Each structure stands twice: as structure tokens, then as C-alpha cells.
Amino acid sequence: MSTPSSRGTTSGSPAEKQVGEGDRRGRREADLSGRPSPAKVAVVLGGSHTGMLAAAALAGLADRVVVVERDELPGEPAPRKGLPQARHAHMLWSGGVRAMEDLLPGVTGTLTDAGARRAPVTTDMVVLSAHGWFRRWPESHHVILAGRDLLDATVRTRVLADDRVEVLGGTEVLGLTGDARAVTGVRVRERDGRERTIDAGMVVDATGRASGTPRWLTDLGLPAPERREVDSGLAYASRLYLAPEQARDGFPVINVQPDTRAAGPGRAGFLLPIEDGRWIVTLNGTRGGEPSPADDDFVRFAREELRHPLIGDLISRAEPLSGVSFTRTTVNRRYFYERMPAWPENFTVLGDALAAYNPVYGHGLAVGAQSALVLRDLTWRYGWGSAGLSRRVQKAVARPVGAAWELATGQDVFYPGASENGPTARDRAVAAYVSRLMYTATGNGRIARRVTDVTSLERRAEVLLAPGVLLAAAVGPLKPTLTEPPLTAEELKRAELR
């Protein structure tokens, strides 16, 4: 059955679509006259992952979708100024993969054909939790692993293959037009300094952490939104490596997690195998335990500061392909727009503009995809321009947003100074139960699957309160705790550790 977003799109790899894409984009940017009335025009602010998926969501419903982007978007996988986080590790959990595939059928295959890795969870994961090493249970879910540049270019190519979608690159958003009752368009400044208004029947803010929506709403006469922040003080340091030759294909994810029960800062690390035989390695630490931005301290931190030296041992045998990229932009921040007493028609906020998470949990990409799918489905169900549609969408996207928010802040709130008042009694009770579940999951495959049901964003946290899960948590793990990383002898040999 066709969906509103899949009609008029074509598939193909970024390399296949690169030729001619710049010409198509240029024609779209130049031709802004003689188009449909504003009532059937959608404007998406931001051309990153969530913005492009929102454009795909609306392409089958609007006559024209205009993506307004501050950067000039590349026609192939390449860095850009407005996405510094692309230098760090990213993963797309299966809950987000399914949503993205619904919006852009076949895009997962296009990604894997271009070199992205589909890693089964927890089969291809070597994870040290606070309670010990997880076993590598049979596949329950999966993650897509790829450099952010490849992921974005693949999605962008698919979306822009639809002639109803156009990009205004090098364009700054100045504000919204309309009033407290309804948004009617956006004011922009183009690359030549010219300011103008784009009238629209729907506006989506997907501009990320730097979103101007709180200010734009007050400019329209609406109250400031409720906001909550949980800041663990996490600092991120990432570096790209070429894996040893025999470990360039099929090597597992490596994750050394912090123990939030221990006093002092938390330190952790990820090693993600991505395209072209590379490993992207991200090390992080909370206040007082931050990694250094210095290249020559990267391996030392991984070996000596994490709870196990495995990542440091692995990268000491790999070839560095980049210097260290460093950031402190990791605060959890959520705007509760769904709670506002009034909400303007024709306006929706998605992605990091709505809620930004500590990236260590890897949920931002998945939530963006799920939210774009909600936008498509509700617009299709209730009809373009229907009364109350934007408020319905804003309330509905709070569901996937809230699931990821609870997962992130439920851990981070325990670090010193993370929130104004510290963890609540509820936070402590939930954390104690989750800790017991994680302990049980080290030696119980069924409970490990229930946990990954939630972390993959495929099911809600209520599944963890089922009677069978409660009983299993009371019993604890059925197998003894592993004392060493569950790498096979062959994997150790391929990584030159044996």
C-alpha cells in the first residue's frame, strides 16, 4: 500500500544521485514564483536528519515543501559547519530505523549498500554495564552504524529526489509570521542579505539545539514554554581510526559504561565500526572526569580512566585517521510545548529543537524519525490545515520524546550538579529497579530482550513492569557474571590482541 510520503520518490545511493543534484537544487532555489498557494506550502526550518525526514513526511501532503537551511548542503557525504556533532559517534536504534524506513522505503538498504553497518543487538555488542559484562544474546533488535555524513547524505538524496521538495541553502531564519492563533509563514535572510517572508500553511521547526522557537512564540504574544535541563557536565572526545586489516568487517560494537552507583565522575567509551573499515571512537566523562582534547592523551584515557582497558588496547593497534574532536554540548534540555495553554495553528517543533539528549544514549536520531512519522500520520488522518492539527501533533510527539527523555535523565540526574534539586524520590525508586533489571539482564536473555525493547525505542517502558519481568528481577540473573569481555578468540586475533 502506498503511503503519502513514498509517492514521487526514487531510491539510489548518494553516489548515484550526486550527479545533477546540485543543478536540481539550484533550480528549486531560484524558482520561488508561480507555485501553489501558501495554504498547501510547508516550510521546514533545518535541513539535518529530522528536518529532511519532516520534509519527506509532508511531501505527499503538501504541493510544495521548502527546507530552509543556514548551511549550504553538500551533494555528497561531507562535513558542514552547522553539524559539528557529526564528528562523534552516532547510532540509529531499530525503533528509529523502522520509522525512517516507513517514510523512505528502501533507505536502510541504500545505507548498507553504501557501507553502513546493521549490527544485531546484543549479538554484535560487547558491553560492560555497571553490573558486569552482558552476554551476547541472540538478536532482539538492531542498530544502524554509519558516519553522520553518510547517514545525512543518504537521507537527503532520497528526500530531494522528490521534485516537491526544495532547499533554500545559506538562509537564516529570522522569525515567524502570524499571531498567537496561527503561524502564517517565516521571515528569512538569504545569502545575499535580502530579507523576505515565505508564506506557508505549515511550518516545522527542526533547527536543533539552537532553536529560536521560545523567543518566536513570545514575539507572537504567547507565554514562554516550560523548560527542564539535566546537565551531567559530560564532555565528549572522539577520534576516527582505520581498524586493523582483519578487523575491518564484522567487528562488534564495544561499549564500556560508567557505574553511576559509584562516587565521583562517570567515564565511558564507545567503539563503533562504520563504513570503509573505520572505527569511530568516542570517550566521555562527567565533571571532574572529562577526557582531554589532546591527541596524545586519547589512548591513555581509554586504557587508564575507563573501567576496563579494552577500547584503549584496541585503538592502540589501529591507525588514527583524524585528530580529536571535543565538545561539551551534551546537556539534556526539553521544552514542554505540549503543556502550553495555547498553541498556534500551522506550527510544529520536532527533533533537538523540542528535546535534546545527552548523546551517549544514542536516541536523538531515532526520536527525530519517529516524530516525523507522527507528523505524517496525523496530518494524513486529520487533514491538511484542520483545526487543532498542530496541537495534536505536538502532544503526540511528546510520547517518543518522553520515552527517550526518561532513559537519559533517569541516569544523568544522579551526577553532582546535574539538576537544580537533584534526584527525586521517584527518580531513586525507578533507578533502583532499573539497576536490578540491568543486573538481571547480565545473566537472563529474556530480561535482556525486555530491556532492549525499551532502549531501542520499539516498546514503552511499561513492558518492564509486566509480572514476569518483576518476578525475574526478584530472582536475579540465571547465569554467573562474566569476568572477561565476551570476544571470541577469532575476534581477538583479528584485532591483533592475541
Give, region by region, the residue ranges found by the protein language model.
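Short beta-strand to alpha-helix junction loop
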Residues: 91-92, 138-157, 212, 292-293
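N-terminal FAD cofactor-binding segment of flavoenzymes
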Residues: 57, 77-126
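FAD/FMN-dependent oxidoreductases across multiple families
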Residues: 289-403
